[in-house]
Amino acid sequence: MMKPFGKVLCAAGSLAVLLAFFWRDTFQPEQLSGARVLLTGASAGIGEQMAYHYATFGAEIVLTARREAVLQEVMKKCLTLGAKKVFYIPADMSSPSEPDRVVQFAVQNLGGLDYLVLNHIGVSPFQMWGGDVEHTRWLMQVNFFSYVALATAALPTLEKNHGSVVVVSSLTGKIPTPFTTSYSATKFALDGFFSSLRHELTMQKRNVSITLCILGLIDTDAALEKTRGKVFIAASPAAEAALAIIRGGAARLRELFYPWWLQPVHGLWVLLPNPRVLQSFYNYSGP
């Protein structure tokens, strides 16, 4: 006889298949031709791949990250791929003054914004909580407060253009997982703030969409290095994740789960939270 956990998992999987069957992908790459995009965390990983996709679709892009030399290389490649315009601005989002400066730069150079894509993250160890409160404060500034500041600064121009805010988050902002205490806290904060803001924008009839992107483990160098030997989950391709994020933002989805099976997993957790099942995906060999 199937156990209750197995029944719920089977039901969640069946629902996901049913939704996939009836959902029709209406994405047209042409709709991003000439779109004005501010993309953060654009120097590596998912952000770099998003930059190349947007360039291929003919967007106008402002790239930002900390490393200027790398941004220059990404900009050059974007131009060869077909971007109509590309600018870059180095910025360290641990500084509270940077978000306003970055948005002003983007608006001045592009004449406005259609998409604000928030993707940057601060480096955080993948380990048990060690009591580093100062690191958590710093991480909240980079991973959360700077997102709030960027979105706040960009809302006026996004509203004029019926634009979109695309927030790259993580399953750790929906389901608390081990080894990610500080990181998970920042992602839960993103979910709470932007989900609440979405309600308020709708109630005020302000035509700005917010797409929250919930990602699993992605095969970026940084993620693979940190999780090696600690997580029993296959990593998904960064280029595919980047494209899924762009499509979700263009479709003005409320939430996007990538890979797709994270959605039934999250639904299962909401219905039947089971810490032991969750912990079975992690390897803890410490004291």
UniProtKB/Swiss-Prot annotation:
Q: Name one GO cellular component term.
A: intracellular membrane-bounded organelle
The reply to whether Signal figures as a keyword in the UniProt entry is: yes
Q: Name one GO molecular function term.
A: oxidoreductase activity
Q: Which domain of life is it from?
A: Eukaryota
Enzyme class, UniProt record, top EC level: oxidoreductase
What InterPro entries is this protein classified in? 11-beta-HSD, NAD(P)-bd_dom_sf, Sc_DH/Rdtase_CS, SDR_fam
Q: Where in the cell is it found?
A: Secreted
Q: Where does the UniProt entry say this protein principally localizes?
A: secreted
Any idea of its EC number? 1.1.1.-
Q: Which residues form the signal peptide?
A: 1-20
Query: Where, by residue number, does NADP(+) bind?
Result: 41-67, 92-93, 119-121, 183-187, 216-222
> Which family does the similarity line name?
Belongs to the short-chain dehydrogenases/reductases (SDR) family.
The record describes the protein's role as: Unidirectional NADP(+)-dependent cortisol dehydrogenase (in vitro).
Q: What is this protein called?
A: Hydroxysteroid 11-beta-dehydrogenase 1-like protein
Q: Which organism is it from?
A: Gallus gallus (Chicken)
Q: Which gene encodes it?
A: HSD11B1L
